[in-house]
Amino acid sequence: MTHDTTSRPSSSRVWRLLLVGSALTAVVGGGMHPDSDASDPLRERLATMTADDQWVLGHAFIVVSTALLALGLRAARQAPGWSPAVRRALTVAAVAVGLYVVETVAHLAAVVDSDALAAGDAAPVAWAHVGLSAVLYPLSGWAIASLALATARGASPLRRVVAGVGLLAGVVHAASIPLMLLLPDLEASRLFPVAAIGIALWTLGTGLLGAPRTAPAGTEVPDRAPQPVT
């Protein structure tokens, strides 16, 4: 008679598939994001982009991508091989990215204010999305950067490279909206695709690599092989 360990590898596959799916949908959605002149005022840029036919579908992919990432990070906490510090960072990141999903939905919904933005009228949904992004971009970005840093400690060289990409992408993501709002002449909106591509690469790399087979010193990794009951 043996213990049933089928749920453990199945759970491991689920979170990794969620992360890979998040990365792929992020690439699709990001590739559909409308362009605008970074030197234009924010209202004008929003009016231009929300009027584009690709806005709704592209941002729908981004909503799905962000939701998959939040679910994947939450599920990854159960994977054997993580240190306690990484598990804590996964918990924080799952919550932060889960909150960031709200911003992506508001971002998508800003399309309802497209005409109002162009006419200079009140655009409550569009500006609500900007307000949410001012809080949730830094929150989710620093959570991702902190998680990437935690996974780099004691990791293999390849995992450190992936973590380095996540650290850089998280910092850029966190800083992009505050810089855009506080220093409009800096044209910080150019940072958005850099952060998006970096996070997608980090997410894909983490999903493909999975959790380490051995935890850092001081932590015990359960044996994944079936054990006989005596």
Task: Briefly describe each language-model feature range.
Residues 2-230:
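Hydrophobic, aromatic-enriched alpha-helical segments typical of multi-pass transmembrane helices
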